[in-house]
Swiss-Prot record:
Cytoplasmic topological intervals: 1-98, 142-1178
CDD domains documented for this protein: C2A_Tricalbin-like, C2B_Tricalbin-like, C2C_Tricalbin-like, C2D_Tricalbin-like, SMP_TCB
Species annotation: Saccharomyces cerevisiae (strain ATCC 204508 / S288c)
Bias type Polar residues, positions: 1-17
Residue pairs linked by disulfide bridges in the UniProt entry: none
Quaternary structure and interacting proteins, as annotated: Interacts with TCB1 and TCB3 via its C-terminal domain.
Protein name: Tricalbin-2
Phosphoserine modifications at: S991
Length: 1178
């Protein structure tokens, strides 16, 4: 059955020996009447509709014509490929079977034919000679191939003399067995990807209406590793090996028809539709052999391999059979053209030499490839200091030298210095930042002489090997000579420093470590598509321009004006100040007229990509532009400029109420869960742990700053197991579309949503657990920061200076270049000024009139007592640090950091700076040194200029700190967020009246027990026993620490003391602490409910509350996942109903008392509150 047969191919079972017959390989049916998919391709502004065709045959089964009946049986496998021949049984072995025998046969056949023809014999005699010599040649060639097979088997058996190269037969055996199974799938993927790329390729000429792979198979013989050698004398983190790879066709000369269908050679048929005809080109019997050297640079973190260098030790040996018009009778073998194969080899050597042949290699950065962003591996800083002894060119008309430098990578100029006028010894002291794709491409530095009218002249070049930067990222005072005609013509002094791109690291548990929030890095901006451009115009073509900080950096190609355009144009850039980078997209027609535009801060573009909102609306509603922006932080050393704080638009309050039905990864017990709130993947706040529960109730609010309404905010739940290890329990993305609103003045407004929201936690193992939360948004008052105010003053000064310069210039004498420079400068200043035009300028005294606001903290430097420490910043009653530095490798802090926190009451707020050994240490754990300072004093002393803070403890440290203060538009904040929510509560049990008498004498021996949130089986306060009375008087007091007054409650149990039996309850009540006045003493007359629901009398209590910030965390015990204390926990939301059988409850109204009819507190009372419905008191 030939490949061109119209018979349908069905899924078949592989017939290769050793393959499980149950394994099926999907074969694609031949589809003749399928409707081709049309792909629209834009070429030079012209739209081409190119058909995407389906292949006819894919995989070895379809191409080889394999059917069910062709499956090889055990008898077929035993058939000898060297079948006996008639002459082989008659002639002695010495008369046939070698190469010279075949030559002799051809000579004898030629001589015999000549003699018969010379003596006028008929053609029949020649046919007898042909038959005889043909049989003899066939017998000899079969014997010769048999001897070659025996020799190959002998080579595999005999031990090699040298042992440098090793065989990898185990891998080759594995491939031999499984290649027939996977080859159809591999071929199908290659065909699908190739046909899609061919249908969309703009480089294909227009007259080719369709081009596709019609048949494709790699054959049943897999690629093979012939030899491998590993070098021993390398560094411990470097592996170098030489590998010989080969791919050879299978010899099918001695196989019968059934065996041929099970052993298929590689075959590729490419078809092109030209002028209505399908023209095929076939490539078969592909062979190659290549010696490759691999160099693996290892690292300690996943994926364990940092870079792979690939180098071809020689030009690969390649051979194939290529026929124009395929296998038809009119086919023509392309390689039959004399000299074509040699030309191919020469061209391969020419283009492979500067890329893959020694000493060059192709470097693959594995973390970069896994990130799928296509960003460079890092930033190279070239600090050009000076040059001296530059020798000008002989015979130059200019007598002076105006040198400047260019920096070139891969034949492309990537940076330039300024022109230094009239000096052979220039001093630049200039830093150039360039993007680096790999270390293998050398850096070319050329010095040019600037000429006004003529083209600039090259004076010399330097080629620097960047591989030195891999081991040592910093090279100082490099001195190299410029060469011209291989002679030195000057010396250059410069510094090189490499800053690697920071990629997310994969932890051993599979989670990704979030990227640090840095102000410097690398960005890739891709202008993808334009849609909605319906405006009719006689201008047929459209293009887009990208301006970054008012500088034109990229122009897309011109495309034909349609409703949907595609560009996919990329722009890469080093960003030294992300928060101030402004991008402007301008849409123009072919005449240069502006159609529409859009201005977007870089931060907004990054946020849009993060939340998959890449379509940007253009001005005046003229379409939408799709822009994808990738960002990777790079720790570029820019001094104080590298630390920048971005002004937020407001604070998002996330009140995390509770979680239910959490996953439990702890096999020894229950986890202790907590929740984090993250912005763009960076954690900004967290709750406290709740001990050993799968249904935690937190009732904690977390404020996070948002710099744009497009940022992704998520809640992540974690759990601490018995061993103290953290487990990710899942996360949910908060929907913030309806939270950010603006008024008529284009200012954000307050948003408070009292309705609970519930979301499912999505983890690696699926959906498990829910979280209930509330959202509010408090916008920041638009005021200029200190840095922005200075920049506005500078802009105004430059504007005035530019206006004066324009007034002194004459329009007739001014050059075109000068006009263009002034125009660009005006545009740049206007664009910068527009960024701050809506903000007010307030001095410090005016800012401090606002009691609530966002405190931005920037640590610029400092000295620590020892290396390997962390600096934490705590605020108010937060038990966990709001800002934590990275681990400081040395004592001196050279790279600063910044963060912020929502200050609710500036007059009471306290800030704590602390130095610890543990990154996640809470406020109750050990520290090395710290300083506590009122936040208002911190603002007063560190607002206008940085100040030094001295930290004292076991050792001492110093921090250089500067802060900023941004007021928040909030007339009233929730009570649970104020200082009155925590403090010391003094409880006085005064007396009781009309208690239930349970003794025989009609009296009782009463005493009172107090529980906080019912989290403990033992009371925290118990009064003395009053004998034989129904109206006892105690006047006993107890002071406790309360961390969540609004959401905590007291459970009161009045009992009768029994000396012989167990004590009996004679009355219960629940008192929410939110009903207590935090500013004055509160006296309650609390009705008690008896055991049977009857009136149990009245209890007289007095509460005195002293607000202060408390530590609401406990120290974690070493080596245990539990905590020393389990008494800390919040309860129900005040304001919700507390049901208790026979129990009275104090409601939310101050001084009012209510009764409830039924509940869960009778004999079936639960000792936990995990199942109670919890709501928030605001």
């Amino acid at each position: 059955m030939s490949p061109n047969s119209s018979k349908t191919r069905t899924d078949q079972i592989s017939s290769m020996p050793g393959i499980n017959e149950a394994t099926k390989v999907e074969s694609k049916n031949v589809v003749k009447d399928a409707v081709p998919i049309k792909s629209e391709v834009e070429t030079n502004g012209t739209s081409i509709v190119r058909e995407k065709q389906d292949p006819s045959y894919v995989g070895w089964k379809q191409v080889g014509g394999w059917e069910e009946k062709d499956e090889l049986t055990s008898e077929d496998l035993l058939v000898d490929v060297n079948k006996d021949t008639f002459l082989g049984n008659l002639l002695p072995d010495k008369f046939y079977g070698d190469w010279y025998h075949e030559v002799a046969i051809l000579i004898i056949a030629g001589l015999c034919s000549f003699v018969l023809g010379y003596f006028k014999f008929s053609l029949a005699s020649v046919l007898i000679v042909m038959l005889t010599t043909g049989m003899l040649y066939r017998t000899s060639s079969k014997k010769y191939r048999e001897s070659l097979r025996d020799l190959a088997q002998k080579e595999q058996t005999v031990e090699k003399i040298t042992s440098d190269y090793e065989s990898v037969e185990w891998l080759n055996t594995f491939l031999d067995k499984y290649w027939p199974i996977i080859e159809p799938s591999v071929s199908q993927q290659i065909v699908d990807g190739t046909n899609t790329a061919l249908s969309e390729n703009v480089a294909i000429p227009k007259f080719i209406k369709a081009i596709w792979l019609d048949q494709f198979t790699l054959g049943v013989k897999p690629p093979r590793i012939d030899a491998i050698k590993t070098f021993q004398n390398t560094k411990s983190d470097v592996v170098v090996m030489d590998v010989c790879l080969s791919f050879t066709p299978h010899d099918m000369s001695d196989l019968d028809a059934k065996q041929c269908r099970n052993y298929v050679n590689s075959n590729v048929v490419l078809k092109a539709k030209i002028f209505g005809m399908d023209i095929p080109v076939s490539v078969a019997d592909i062979f190659f052999q290549v010696f490759v050297r691999f160099r693996f640079q290892l690292m300690t973190t996943l994926p364990l391999v940092e870079t792979i260098n690939i180098q071809l030790l020689e030009v690969p040996e390649v051979d194939f059979i290529s026929r124009l018009l395929g296998n038809s009778v009119f086919n023509w073998e392309i390689l039959a053209i004399p000299g074509l194969m040699r030309l191919i080899q020469k061209m391969a050597f020419k283009y492979l030499s500067p890329v893959l042949l020694p000493p060059f290699s192709l470097q693959l950065n594995i973390p970069q490839l896994l990130s799928k962003t296509g960003l460079p591996i890092g930033v190279l800083e070239i600090k050009v200091k000076n040059a001296h002894g530059l020798r000008k060119l002989v015979g130059m008309i200019k007598k002076t030298v105006d040198p400047y430098l260019t920096f070139e990578l891969s034949g492309k100029i990537v940076g330039k210095t300024k022109v230094f006028k009239n000096s052979a010894n220039p001093v630049w002291n200039e830093s150039i930042y360039i993007l680096l794709q790999s270390f293998t491409d050398p850096l070319t530095i050329a010095v040019y002489d600037k000429r006004e009218t003529l083209s600039d002249k090259k004076m010399g070049t330097v080629i620097f090997n960047l591989n030195k930067l891999h081991a040592n990222h910093y090279h100082k005072n490099e001195k190299v000579h410029f060469l011209r005609n291989s002679k030195p013509v000057g010396e250059l002094t410069f510094d090189l420093r490499f800053f690697p791109t920071i990629e997310p690291k994969k932890l051993l548990n599979g989670d990704e470590e979030p990227l640090p929030d840095m102000n410097t890095g690398i960005t890739k901006i891709t202008i993808r598509e334009l849609k909605g451009l319906d405006e009719l115009s006689d201008k047929k073509f459209v293009f887009a321009e990208l301006y970054v900080n008012a500088e034109l950096v990229m122009t897309t190609k011109k495309e034909k004006r349609t409703a949907h355009l595609k560009w996919n144009s990329d722009y890469y850039s080093v960003v030294t100040d992300r928060r101030k980078t402004i991008c402007r997209f301008v849409l123009k027609d072919q005449s240069g007229k502006v159609i529409s535009s859009s201005v977007q801060p870089l931060n907004h573009l990054i946020d849009r990509t993060e939340v998959n909102k890449e379509w940007i609306p253009l001005r005046n509603g003229k379409g939408e532009l799709k822009v994808t922006t990738y960002w990777r932080p790079v720790d570029i050393d820019l001094g104080l400029k590298s630390v920048g704080y971005t002004t937020p638009i407001g604070m998002l309050r996330v009140f995390i109420n509770k979680a239910e039905n959490l996953r439990n990864p702890d096999s020894l017990g229950k986890i202790s869960p907590y929740a984090k709130v993250s912005v763009n993947g960076v954690a900004r706040g967290r709750t406290n742990e709740r001990i050993e529960t799968l249904n935690p109730i937190w009732n904690q609010s977390i404020y996070v700053s948002v710099t744009s309404p497009l940022q992704k905010v998520s809640i992540d739940c974690f759990g601490i197991d018995t061993n103290g290890d953290d487990h990710n329990l899942g996360s949910l993305n908060i929907q913030t579309q309806n939270i950010y609103h603006k008024d008529n003045d284009d200012k954000y407004t307050i948003f408070i949503d009292n309705a609970p929201r519930t979301g499912n936690l999505i983890g690696k193992k699926g959906v498990k657990g829910t979280v209930t939360y509330y959202l509010s948004f408090y916008p920041v008052v638009p005021v200029l920061s200190l840095e922005e105010a200075k920049e506005v003053d500078e802009i105004n000064e430059k504007k005035d200076k530019l206006e004066k310069q324009k007034s002194t210039l004459d329009d007739k004498n001014i050059s075109k270049e000068e006009k263009e420079r002034i125009k660009k400068e005006e545009f740049r200043l206007t664009e910068k000024y527009d960024m701050y035009s809506y903000k007010m300028k307030l001095d410090l005294d005016e800012l401090l009139q606002y009691n609530a606001g966002v405190l931005g903290v920037t640590v610029l430097g400092g000295e620590l007592p020892q290396p390997g420490l962390y600096v934490q910043t705590f605020f108010d009653s937060c038990g966990y640090a709001a800002i934590t530095s990275a681990k400081n490798a040395i004592r001196t802090i050279k790279t600063g950091w910044s963060g912020d926190f929502m200050i609710k009451e500036l007059e009471w707020s306290v800030t704590t700076f602390r130095v610890t050994k543990t990154k996640d240490a809470n406020k109750a754990e050990n520290f090395i040194c710290e300083v506590n300072i009122p936040t208002i004093e911190l603002v007063r002393n560190c607002y206008y200029k940085p100040s030094v803070l001295n930290l004292i403890g076991k050792k001492s440290a110093k921090l250089l700190v500067q802060v900023s203060w941004f007021p928040v538009t909030a007339t009233e904040l929730p009570q649970s967020d104020l200082i009155t929510n925590s403090g010391d509560l003094k409880i006085t049990a005064k007396s009781a009246e009309n208690l239930i008498g349970v003794n025989k004498n009609g009296y009782s021996d009463p005493y009172v027990e107090f529980f906080l949130n019912e989290k403990s089986t033992s009371p925290f306060f118990k009064t003395a026993v009053q004998k034989k009375t129904l109206n006892p008087t105690w006047n006993e007091s107890k002071t406790i620490e309360v961390s969540n007054r609004v959401n905590d409650y007291l459970t009161i149990n009045v009992k009768d003391y029994e000396s012989t039996n167990s004590n009996r309850s004679i009355g219960k009540a629940v008192v929410p602490l939110s009903t207590i006045d935090p500013e004055s003493d509160t006296t309650f007359n609390i009705p008690l409910v008896g055991p049977k629901g009857e009136d149990g009398g009245v209890l007289h209590l007095e509460f005195e509350f002293e607000p202060r910030y408390t530590t609401n965390v406990v120290k974690r015990e070493a080596g245990l996942g539990n905590f020393a204390t389990k008494g800390l926990g919040t309860g129900i939301k005040a304001g919700s109903t507390v049901f208790a059988l026979g129990t009275n409850v104090v409601s939310t109204g101050l001084g009012t008392i209510d009764k409830v009819k039924a509940g869960v507190f009778g004999g079936k009372k639960s000792t936990t509150t995990g199942d109670k419905k919890s709501e928030e008191k605001q």
